[in-house]
Amino acid sequence: MKLSSSKEFGALIKKVRKQQVLTQIDLANACSVSTGFIIDLEKGKASCELDKSLNVAAMLGIRFEAHEQPKINEQE
């Protein structure tokens, strides 16, 4: 799955959390973050800290791969 926005990332977090029958409070406690952080993350708030966001994803079993895109002048 290719994610292109913080809203898509948040929707994925929410979907997987619900599939695992976890409340926002459960997930927050498991990740040592506030419930407010989980709420903001699931809403796609762009200012959520990356390290915390990736920790939440990892706790849910979501894995990511990063790929470098070619620069514009390299595509020619």
Regions found by a protein language model. Name each.
Residues S32-A46:
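Recognition helix of helix-turn-helix/homeodomain-like DNA-binding domains
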Residues K45-A57:
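Short, basic-rich loop-to-helix N-cap that marks the start of a DNA-contacting helix
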